[in-house]
């Protein structure tokens, strides 16, 4: 890992990013799902439904949902009968997820505080590994990908949905203006936290483009990697297999 890593548009020490990202999500946890609805116009729900259809959870198979915090993806996969472990480095996000599960009468999920770079699971523990809008916040992405590969069984599936760079002509300017100007102001007005949402917008710009991230997934040992662009590439679903 390099001596510095990105935190939005800043370059900082790796340990500092872990701490500062933790602070961001501790601040936004209570309003995280509401802000997702507001900022995406509810579209994130459709993206997540599409993502889970790609994962194709099977009854009783073991799935690790990393950075799964508030449970949005886990609830969808559990509804299809999968045995889901929700892992997140941030306890406040997990607490929100546990509360949401109780309110919905959803049980059977395992909730665990985990660092994606150093998972506390034996090798070959899971049939599938999912991470949605989380990997760009990881300090050492190659380490997290290596851990995902390690904990998957042979034949296991890796699926990641993350923001990316749009390829639609003219849309990039609109998207940039929205994320840099509107998102932080929404954070200020709704969550009383402009700076956290400024970081979240900036972190999208610093995340590797689709081809580069796909190459990183391959370098971690995954085969048959694919990328599915959504909304002209503003969002992408990455997948790979452990063979």
Q: Model-derived features: where do they sit?
A:
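N-terminal auxiliary segments of SAM/dcSAM-dependent transferases
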Residues: 1-23
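Conserved alpha-helix/loop element of class I SAM-dependent methyltransferases that forms part
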Residues: 27, 31-34, 38-61
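Class I SAM-dependent methyltransferase SAM/SAH-binding core
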Residues: 62-119
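A short acidic, Gly/Pro-enriched loop at the edge of an enzyme's catalytic core
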Residues: 117-129
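A short SAM/SAH-binding and catalytic strip from SAM-dependent methyltransferases
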Residues: 127-141
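A short glycine-rich, Lys/Arg-flanked "PGG" loop and its adjoining helix->strand segment in the class I
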Residues: 142-157
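Conserved class I S-adenosyl-L-methionine
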Residues: 157-187
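Core SAM-dependent methyltransferase catalytic element
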Residues: 214, 220-243
